[in-house]
Amino acid sequence: MYRSMAILSSLRHAYSQISTRSYLSRSKVGFSSNLSSPLDSFAIVPSRFLWKFRTFSSKPDSMLQLVLENDWSKEVEEGLRKPDMSLTHETAIYVLRKLEKYPEKAYYFLDWVLRDSGLSPSTPLYSIMLRILVQQRSMKRFWMTLREMKQGGFYLDEDTYKTIYGELSKEKSKADAVAVAHFYERMLKENAMSVVAGEVSAVVTKGDWSCEVERELQEMKLVLSDNFVIRVLKELREHPLKALAFFHWVGGGGSSSGYQHSTVTYNAALRVLARPNSVAEFWSVVDEMKTAGYDMDLDTYIKVSRQFQKSRMMAETVKLYEYMMDGPFKPSIQDCSLLLRYLSGSPNPDLDLVFRVSRKYESTGKSLSKAVYDGIHRSLTSVGRFDEAEEITKAMRNAGYEPDNITYSQLVFGLCKAKRLEEARGVLDQMEAQGCFPDIKTWTILIQGHCKNNELDKALACFANMLEKGFDIDSNLLDVLIDGFVIHNKFEGASIFLMEMVKNANVKPWQSTYKLLIDKLLKIKKSEEALDLLQMMKKQNYPAYAEAFDGYLAKFGTLEDAKKFLDVLSSKDSPSFAAYFHVIEAFYREGRLTDAKNLLFICPHHFKTHPKISELFGAAA
């Protein structure tokens, strides 16, 4: 209670116009809770929300189920050998991806695949296994698999290496990270295949595809294999159309080697072609590989979907999802909910795409999870379709899921986006009435909605109300409120507010929050306040945001200002050479040669003979 009182006092000090009345009033927009029965409520939901359920199985799922539900044994291996369990490379990829949380089962399964199934090893199979073992910290088996991979003539590709290295660099696995880095560097030096792949890439990329390019490639007398073709495609990933030309040349008899593409190389080509300027070619190769009897594997789907999403290719992402759901290697419910979240994150979600995803998932006969319901609801509220959002909520309830803070927060967000702020505030009262108490995220969304709609006074009133409910401010909410001050050009008020929150609420602002506010304060020449924030940054163990001050001091600061700045940057003894040099250099570049030399005069003696100082001023310095 004492902390809340202190914070409220700080709030009034930072922004004197806070209204004392509560702006949280009841509203008609929200969720109904007085449903008479599930059947009655279901009757009012439009047909597109009537989810049907039926059983579904496939050979890949049967194989996965066998491995998941049993300890590894000879009986499991015999079951995997049954005629109705025919194994393909795509099926092996699918099962491994689904076993990501079960490293021991994944390890035994891959061992059986490579030892006893008759399926040829491949870089993608090894890569997935390595990622699983690292994520689950099964390091003994990781190193065994990596050595086996190398002995078999396969390579650790760059993407897999980066994923593994990034995972191992966390916390207590840094020794393994260093060892993997050494392994990768040594592999690159020892592997002659990568050198030849680089030479092929150089030939292909130097101009348009032509008879001359084909002649040069023929003269190289390439030894073609799946592994080599994958290497070249990786080298050509920034030139997808040229990669496709090479792909068709090696597989179409142009190389005169008799080489035929496999599912591994088709999938590798798809990963390269999944870009805005080659999407037509991507779908052409999808059709081509289907005709050849191959399928897109689950690992390729996940990576291509991410590429499409990164490029904001929403329609292609949904088309890809539909394609996979029609095949044997269906994405998981988590993939569906993540896709809906991606679609709802657009400024104006395309509801046609949203419902295409949900209908396609529904067509498999599986029941929708709460995450999927929330994904649909999020898009509807984002575009202001609140009546239909309410229908989804009723369907969710009928399926056994109660609205929670996620669901309500989406409604609050949509109402704020639609500038229906009073109704948004009323949702929080409704939540409490229905026994679902708003959490800090819900309050933050409400407060941010007011800030974005230029209603800082009401945002701060909501904040005060939140404190009275017993919540403490966190870094995210502090950033939201500082943005609200900044939108109103209340930079000094923001600075006071931030410093009081650090003092009274024991909150640690984000580094980006400090940087934003320092930039704004320097913009209005409030260097003293900016220095106070810089000093606070240092106390909270952030790197000092010094670069913002260098240019400011050179244009507007005095020599005394520069000294104060350097004092703030000082550690136990004195500021570093870099701190002194950047300010001296800024003065020099601004034409303030006298001030630059005066600052140099007071810096430690050994700094004056530093090569950079000599280079800046000349030997006479």
UniProtKB/Swiss-Prot annotation:
The protein, known as: Pentatricopeptide repeat-containing protein At3g48250, chloroplastic
PROSITE patterns with a match to the protein in the record: PPR
Organism, scientific name: Arabidopsis thaliana (Mouse-ear cress)
The keyword Repeat belongs to this UniProt entry's keyword annotation: yes
Keyword Chloroplast: yes
Subcellular location: Plastid, Chloroplast
Family statement drawn from the similarity comment of this UniProt entry: Belongs to the PPR family. P subfamily.
PPR repeats: 122-156, 157-194, 262-296, 297-331, 332-368, 369-403, 404-438, 439-473, 474-509, 510-544
Transit peptide extent on chain: 1-67
Annotated GO biological process: RNA splicing
